């Protein structure tokens, strides 16, 4: 399936329904809606009987999520946001398929007309529940792994999980042009093109970007972007942007692009 990307900006935080309607001018036909901070591993095949698919994952604390209830035919019969009492342990992960996105667009337009005050949020769930009331068939898609990138802590965890998946699949994670001098690499780790690591112990769960230099460091569970320079750091959790120069000894650090700190 080919992709024809467009970018629309949501200038005000008015909910997930509003975010979708920011792209109203191009909403037509089969459409996937996916939250940008979510990574999954799943079979994304579609049920031909479905008007829409919502991908879900079993969770230990369903009260923190939107959850779905299913019948024996894997059809979604209810959608509840952060239930106070147990409804289901199948959490909505933020990836949806609509066979005809125009239907969702129309019901969200009605939500705006009928019930919203100016500046009030509206959510995709309101549109989905309205579609279910119209008799639209929503099926549940299951995912094998659901990884979040919503904050630095979980992003580092997701990076480590992705590295492990890539290792198990036999993918080459260390670029042949990377230089290792008197250093130890504990897999899984990614080392990008032209990176140079000297007198350091790296891993597990570390990604080092293209052209980055690591000197006299001990790094675990860290994400280092491109063309940065780290010196004398012993750190278990680091998120470092592009073109950063950092010298220090933290247990956790998060620095954006073009930062310098000594």
Model-derived features: where do they sit?
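Conserved beta-loop-beta/alpha segment of the NTase-like Rossmann-fold superfamily
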Residues: 1-72
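Short beta-strand-to-turn element immediately C-terminal to the catalytic PLP-Schiff-base lysine
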Residues: 68-71, 97-99, 241, 247
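Structural signal for interior beta-strand "rungs" in well-ordered beta-sheet cores
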Residues: 172-262
């Amino acid at each position: 399936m080919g992709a024809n990307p467009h970018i629309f900006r949501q200038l005000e935080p008015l909910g997930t329904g509003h975010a979708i309607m920011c792209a109203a001018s191009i909403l037509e036909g089969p459409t996937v809606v996916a939250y940008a901070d979510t990574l999954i591993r799943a079979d994304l095949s579609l049920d031909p009987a479905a008007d829409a698919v919502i991908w879900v994952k079993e969770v230990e604390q369903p009260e923190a999520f939107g959850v779905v209830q299913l019948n024996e035919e894997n059809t979604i019969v209810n959608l509840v946001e952060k239930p106070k009492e147990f409804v289901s342990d199948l959490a909505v992960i933020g990836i949806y398929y609509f066979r005809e996105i125009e239907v969702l667009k129309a019901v969200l337009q009605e939500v705006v007309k009928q019930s919203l005050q100016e500046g009030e949020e509206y959510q995709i769930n309101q549109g989905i529940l309205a579609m279910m009331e119209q008799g639209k068939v929503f099926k549940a898609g299951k995912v094998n792994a659901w990884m979040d990138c919503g904050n630095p802590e979980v992003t580092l965890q997701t990076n480590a999980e992705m590295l492990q998946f890539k290792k198990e699949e036999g993918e080459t994670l260390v670029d042949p042009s990377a230089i290792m001098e008197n250093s130890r690499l504990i897999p899984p780790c990614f080392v990008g093109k032209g990176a140079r690591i000297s007198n350091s112990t790296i891993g597990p769960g570390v990604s080092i970007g293209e052209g980055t230099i690591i000197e006299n460091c001990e790094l675990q569970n860290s994400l280092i972007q491109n063309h940065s320079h780290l010196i004398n750091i012993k750190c278990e959790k680091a998120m470092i942007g592009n073109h950063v120069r950092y010298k220090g000894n933290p247990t956790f650090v998060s620095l954006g692009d073009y930062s310098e700190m000594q």
